[in-house]
């Protein structure tokens, strides 16, 4: 039950990774983000990294294919907005 973080990722302060998270390359995760068990964050590009905004929540098993705005909760495959603060 491990999580992994690939190349060129930037992770902010107070970020929580539950078990089994897969964080692929060129991703920027801002402060106070929670990423649920088994979530997959697809790879960004060096020119346009995938961004998980401040205070966002990624639900268990979600597959994130595009950036998530700050304060947003996303769930599902592919990840869709459940709630926006």
Locate the predicted segments by residue.
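Structural signal for interior beta-strand "rungs" in well-ordered beta-sheet cores
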Residues: 1-75, 80-82
């Amino acid at each position: 039950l491990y999580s992994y973080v690939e190349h060129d990722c930037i992770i902010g302060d107070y970020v929580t990774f539950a078990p089994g998270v897969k964080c692929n390359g060129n991703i920027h995760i801002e402060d106070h983000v929670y990423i649920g068990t088994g979530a997959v964050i697809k790879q960004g590009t060096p020119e346009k990294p995938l961004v998980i905004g401040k205070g966002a929540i990624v639900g268990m098993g979600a597959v994130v294919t595009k950036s998530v705005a700050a304060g947003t909760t996303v769930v599902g495959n592919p990840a869709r907005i459940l709630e926006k603060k």
